[in-house]
Amino acid sequence: MTLPPGAPICRWIYKDEVVDIMPDDENVIGFTNMWYHEALAAKEKRTLSNGIDIYIFSLPYYVATKLEAVKGRGGDDWRWSHDFEDIIYILNYCPTFILTLQSGNVKLIEYLKKEFSDILCRSNISEEVECKLPYGEDDRTEYILDVMKGIVNL
């Protein structure tokens, strides 16, 4: 199995599985994220349907890493940001996201509160959110904005 051209720099084939591996040492792939080290320390184990165990970031840490990525490579127009799309996906399809924050790391929660507060001040945030929702779900824009407000108000 080989990776297609244009695959992300973090994509690898491991034991015949395609995986994205994000190192917390910037010397490995040339960059890192301020949240990778903590996210790796708090990783969660999942077992795939084929019996293989994998480790993933918890949702709050995943969103924090994506927020850092948007700031680093999202540019001024987030309608085109894949990282912002990932954040919107989590906020749209994980109704318990705010509950997962209530018992989490205080530093992480404060970071998320500040970042979502800043996001809500963006002049085009409604359009940016709507552009990242699946076709036909633009009515979810207000819901997503309310989730962001809920995070800020924790």
Please name every model-derived segment.
Residues 1-154:
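Compositionally biased terminal segments of proteins
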